[in-house]
Curated annotation (Swiss-Prot):
This is Uncharacterized protein YfjT. The keyword Signal applies. Residues 1-23 form the signal peptide. Keywords: Signal. To E.coli YkfB.
Amino acid sequence: MKIRSLSRFVLASTMFASFTASAVPGLWQQGYGQGNAEYSVTDASGKMFTINCTGNPDQNGIYQHSVFLILAGDKTVSSHDDSTGITVVMDHKQYAIPSTLGWRNGDNAWFSFIMDIRKARQFDVYVNDQKVGSFNPDVRNAQKVLPTLADCTND
């Protein structure tokens, strides 16, 4: 799983390198490549939060959607990394992003997150219980750009 995560990091970093330089903070952007739809938003300091909605199921037929962050110094962290816990806090609720999907609690957590992120005016991201960023997305932009329920779940 770690090799697959590393290749996803490389792909994601390459795909969004051009977005980082030209991204307007707070506006979601959409990209697509190799069967993955990716939705990214940056903060004022250039940190990028990305939702990866894969169109490629794993060997068990499960769509392993994920999030990743590009932090200062181009350090990338992913929810697929077993040693990394990513939590998103929005509207005074926390959403622990599961490292894998295809199990009831993980699917339920992902479903709640993906349904609520479209409505968030502000959210904070924590990696291993340390706050790493605050994002202030435009809600109207989010509702236009972010995926619908069917695009980014296992339902």
